[in-house]
Amino acid sequence: MRKLSSLVCGAGAGLAAFYLSRLRDPQKAAHSSWTNSEKPVDACGLWDSNWDCRDPRLMVRPLKNTQPEEENRFNADLEKAKPKKARHIILVRHGEYLDVGESDATHHLTERGRKQAQFTGQRLSELGIQWDKVIASTMVRAQETADIILKEIKYDKEKVVNCVYLREGAPIPPQPPVGHWKPEASQFYRDGARIEAAFRRYFHRAYPDQDKESYTLIVGHGNVIRYFVCRALQFPPEGWLRISINHASITWLTISPSGNVSIKYLGDSGFMPVQYLTNRIPRDAKNVV
């Protein structure tokens, strides 16, 4: 009987150790009712810690050997290369505008769009943020939105960076496809490279010498912002069109020193009265999309 008891205890301990080792396997997902517990996490579901190509371990001279002096040198260099503070990137979509005329020069904000921008500027002012940088798309509707916001947040217009890379466009063919919006393949080819370049320019972890958390305000466009959100969170970028954000809404992303990215707001417009909540061009405008 004692032998049988020992055998059962030993088998139980071995089984427990087996399941514990499986739980610790980094390739296993946290299981929900719809997942297959025997299937490893798909590669696209794993976080790429070097998404911005600024992993500190890859920014320093690698170890030549395992001597203590060399290891001390490597660790000292690594510590110097590590970011210390977070970067906050706040994205604001332009206000409602009229798609009138054949060029961007005639696409001005509506009266409601101007009021939306004012509400957003007031909201940003209430947050009490000290802005390190303000960047705006060069398109008229984004410029007009930025001008209104600048007055509310008391930011010098001369310091604003105007960026052509942030102009509206077709970032990547959406999945699932939609029938009402079908740009030519050449437009995706042209716009996609530009918008991706904008993402790489503005989205990265802090530099090692940054000694305080930084706040960057970007005033841009719906397609660009939605693509940025998918890219920053490492969601499939083809899903950008499944997201809807209102005019003059606020999206807030934070890049931590480790390179991890989190989202605080997505298309926040709850600070506006309900009659100012819009996300499409007015019906009486030309080329409604």
UniProtKB/Swiss-Prot annotation:
Catalysis performed (reactions): O-phospho-L-seryl-[protein] + H2O = L-seryl-[protein] + phosphate; O-phospho-L-threonyl-[protein] + H2O = L-threonyl-[protein] + phosphate
EC number: 3.1.3.16
Family: Belongs to the phosphoglycerate mutase family. BPG-dependent PGAM subfamily.
Name the record gives this protein: Serine/threonine-protein phosphatase Pgam5, mitochondrial
Primary localization class, coarse: mitochondrion
Membrane topology: Single-pass membrane protein
GO MF entries: kinase binding; phosphoprotein phosphatase activity; protein serine/threonine kinase activator activity; protein serine/threonine phosphatase activity
